[in-house]
Structure formats: C-alpha cells, structure tokens
From Swiss-Prot:
InterPro entries: AceGlu_kinase-like_sf, Asp/Glu/Uridylate_kinase, Uridylate_kinase, Uridylate_kinase_bac. It catalyses: UMP + ATP = UDP + ADP. It is an enzyme of class 2 (transferase). This is Uridylate kinase.
Amino acid sequence: MAETNSPRYSRILLKLSGEALSGNKDMGIDAQVLDQMSLSIAHLVGLGVQVGIVVGGGNLYRGSQLQKDGLVGRVTGDQMGMLATVMNGLAMRDALVRRNIKTRLMSALSIGTVVEPYSSRDAIRYLSQGEVCVFVAGTGNPFFTTDTAACLRGIEIEANLILKATKVDGVYNKDPSKYDDAVKYDNLTFDQVLDEKLGVMDLTAICLCRDHNVPLQVFDMNKPGALLSVIMGEKEGTHVTK
C-alpha cells in the first residue's frame, strides 16, 4: 500500500477505448461496464483529483473493412469514427451526471447544440472547478488516433499523468493471451517502447508524451480498484517515463 492517503496525481487524462466500453460484447456499450467506470471516476473526483477523459469509438464503428472494400474513403471513415466517440462521450457524461458529478462534454468537431466546442482554456477552468471533462471527436482531424488525441489533450490541460485503460494489466514483451512466457514490464522509458516496438500507443502519441515529459500509465480498467491504486501511487500496471 502507498504510505500516504493523498492522491499522487492532482490532474489526470484517462484514455478509455471504445472496446473497453463494450465489455464482453462484440459491439455497443455494456451498461454494467459503463456504470462501473463512472463509479471509479466518481471516487477520484471525491478525492479531489481533476479528471479529463478521452473516449474511443471502436465499439460503435470500425471502418477498416468498409475502407478495404472501397465503400468509404479514409477521411470519411475517420470522420465516422469521430462521431462514434461523440456517442460514447454522451453516454459517459450522463453516467457521471447520474452520480451527481458535474461533467462537461467537449468536442473537437462543431456539433451545434449537442456538444460544446473544445477549448483548452475552458477545459482547464472546468477542471479547476472540480468538473470532469470528457473530450470527444479525437483531434478533429483524420489520420490521427484517439491515443494521439489523448496525449494531445493531456498535454494541453497540463495533466500530471496520462492513463491508458486496457484489457490487460500492463505492457508485455509479447501478447500474453498468446504466449504463456510473456513478461510484464513494471517500468519502461518512451525510448524503450519505441525501440522494442511494444505497441503501447502509436508512434505520434508516444513521441508527444516523451517530448513533453508527461508520464504514461497502462493498466487494466476492469480490475477492481486498479484506477484508484494508480492515482494513489501504488504499484499497478506499467509506468512509462522519459
């Protein structure tokens, strides 16, 4: 256990993949998973941690097959993916509001009265007031992943830590679901991730974190208490630093 009862990190950026929101389903949002995620985030807010969230959209739209079949272009496919993140963000916002957590949904794309436009200045102000900010539509541009969007938003809001929630409990030297002898890393440097091609995030995302010296934590969001353990500075998942 950590020696202090105070959170180690005061402001974080949490990246939630669309696949994580789908739970054991092939597609869609698992209500139980969404509810549990909102509870975990509410616990952090109760401790005074300022929370920004970037959500993916892979549980609602996967464009690779449509693009492969030539039915939609890459730009259109990426834009469809951005809209999928908006739907996930709406669900996350309402799940948090249901727990009496003030939450702002901010989009990199202009979507009229549905979502307010993203502004780093406004986001920092909301976070400082104790509100959760859910960032959707990625970077607003095609060809950039939501992992890159998460690192970009984390840097912009001056987060102390960027967390990537996955379905495994950290980073391994090879796929633990395929290889019994896979070895988990407790600590890594960004250069190690790049040199060993560990696939933590895409190249652009990792380079952003490295160049701006923002640490990254990879952990299993489905493990009870894992998110809280990370925030309290306990050993959980894999910590990546410069």
